[in-house]
Curated annotation (Swiss-Prot):
Keyword Ribosomal protein: yes
Entries under Gene3D superfamilies matching the protein: 2.30.30.790
Protein name: Large ribosomal subunit protein bL19
Alphabetic keyword roster: Ribonucleoprotein, Ribosomal protein
GO MF annotations in UniProt: structural constituent of ribosome
Function: This protein is located at the 30S-50S ribosomal subunit interface and may play a role in the structure and function of the aminoacyl-tRNA binding site.
Length: 116
């Protein structure tokens, strides 16, 4: 039974995904349909959570816009996601960065990972 499910899911996996983790700053290009037009909307922020495996894997991106924190959760293999760009690698020691929700301003920054 598992082999059947795995073979069906195989065709829906995205192959061109970059490697990223919590603390990384990413740009997510999302396809948005407005009426009959389809355009790309860019959501840039810090990855605070990655959960799940396989097709159901999701990641949450947080950004602060004019003092208001906005979090968006994206399915990793969704056809609505055109592409994901990693702009910065963050150095963190946690898998879930929920503590960033209470921090504002410069305190909410994540250190950049060394280039070695």
């Amino acid at each position: 039974m598992q082999n059947i499910i795995k073979s069906i899911e195989e065709e829906y996996y995205k192959k061109d995904l970059p490697r990223f983790g919590p603390g990384d700053t990413v740009k997510v290009h999302v396809k948005v349909v407005e009426g009959t037009r389809e355009r790309l909307q860019v959501f840039e922020g810090t990855v605070i959570k990655i959960r799940g495996t396989g097709l159901s894997q999701t990641f949450t991106v947080r950004r602060t816009t004019s003092g208001v924190g906005v979090e968006r959760t994206f399915p990793l293999h969704s056809p609505k996601i055109a592409r994901i760009e990693v702009t910065r690698r963050g150095k963190v020691r946690r898998g879930r960065l929920y503590y960033l929700r209470q921090l504002t301003g410069k305190k909410a920054r994540v250190k950049e990972k060394g280039r070695y």
